């Protein structure tokens, strides 16, 4: 089988522990694209937070795609077209805001290059902004500032207390939206059914390709669905155990250019 599409998670997969793409990985992926391989970057990050990596890999030149917000949005990076978007119900936003406020946590959402929040100096808000190479923007009233469709909100704060809030919010909202922690201090609030595999199915249909032509590589729990979905599902050596158990193949770790090993073995 000739694999034509390479789907890559970012943190812990494409990037090393310093959140950088090594020169070896970069060269390998440019070469693969020269040979016609299409790259899809699939991450929980907002679109703007993935953009620097898309530029580094020259996805605009080679016609790659971005799956942001864990599959909440699909963008054709060459044309800039938003191919798919799944957004939060606007009527849920006041409840999310109140949950954060009542527990003295900051809540954020994203617009263009900004992380919008009432608490721009909060240490966890700053952590999220730095991770995504975005700027914080202070708003006086979070709910009034949202005059656009929201792909994701994030409540941030101290891990132990946030875990308690997660339980309460999950029980209250599980029929209507997704509530889970991506880091001990980050509580993700996303539309129901957001899933990398589901969005990849949408992308494949739009570009006329099959999942048998696709390799998906990841390390985290949110990569599980796409690893099971792809023609070849690959786990990094540093992946969570359940991810490694579900994969067709286990490559080297993100500190050992594991993505390079996949391309050299299956796409040369």
Give, region by region, the residue ranges found by the protein language model.
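Asp-based phosphoryl-transfer active-site loop
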Residues: 2-18
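Residue-level signal for inorganic ion chemistry
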Residues: 32, 43, 70, 153, ...
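Short active-site oxyanion
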Residues: 36-40, 64, 152, 212-213, ...
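Short, structured coil segments at secondary-structure junctions
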Residues: 57, 62, 70, 172-175, ...
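Active-site phosphate-binding/coordination module
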Residues: 23-123
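Conserved acidic, metal-coordinating active-site core of Asp-based
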Residues: 99, 103-217
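Mg2+-dependent phosphoryl-transfer enzymes with acidic/Ser/Thr/Gly-rich catalytic loops
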Residues: 1-5, 22, 188-268
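Hydrophobic packing residues within well-ordered alpha-helices of enzyme cores
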Residues: 25, 50-54, 165, 169, ...
């Amino acid at each position: 089988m000739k694999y034509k599409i390479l789907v890559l998670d970012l943190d812990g997969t494409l990037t090393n522990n310093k959140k950088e793409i090594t020169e070896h990985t970069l060269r390998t992926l440019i070469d693969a694209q020269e040979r016609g391989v299409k790259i899809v970057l699939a991450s929980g990050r907002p679109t703007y937070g993935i953009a620097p990596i898309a530029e580094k890999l020259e996805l605009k030149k080679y016609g790659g795609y971005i799956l942001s917000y864990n599959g909440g949005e699909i963008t054709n990076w060459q044309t800039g077209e938003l191919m798919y978007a799944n957004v939060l119900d606007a009527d849920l936003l006041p409840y999310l805001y109140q949950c954060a406020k009542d527990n003295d946590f900051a809540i954020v959402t994203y617009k263009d290059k900004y992380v919008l929040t009432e608490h721009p100096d909060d240490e966890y808000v700053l952590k999220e902004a730095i991770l995504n190479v975005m700027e914080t923007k202070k708003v006086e009233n979070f709910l009034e500032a949202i005059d656009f469709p929201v792909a994701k909100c994030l409540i941030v704060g101290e891990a132990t207390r946030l875990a308690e809030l997660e339980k309460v919010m999950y029980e209250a909202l599980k029929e209507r939206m997704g509530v889970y922690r991506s880091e001990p201090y980050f509580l993700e609030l996303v539309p129901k059914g957001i899933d990398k595999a589901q969005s990849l199915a949408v992308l494949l249909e739009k570009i006329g390709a099959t999942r048998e032509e696709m390799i998906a590589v990841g390390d985290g729990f949110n990569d599980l669905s796409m690893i099971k979905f792809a023609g070849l599902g690959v786990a990094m050596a540093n992946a969570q155990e359940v991810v490694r158990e579900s994969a067709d193949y286990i490559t080297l770790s993100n500190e050992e250019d594991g993505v390079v090993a996949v391309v050299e073995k299956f796409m040369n």
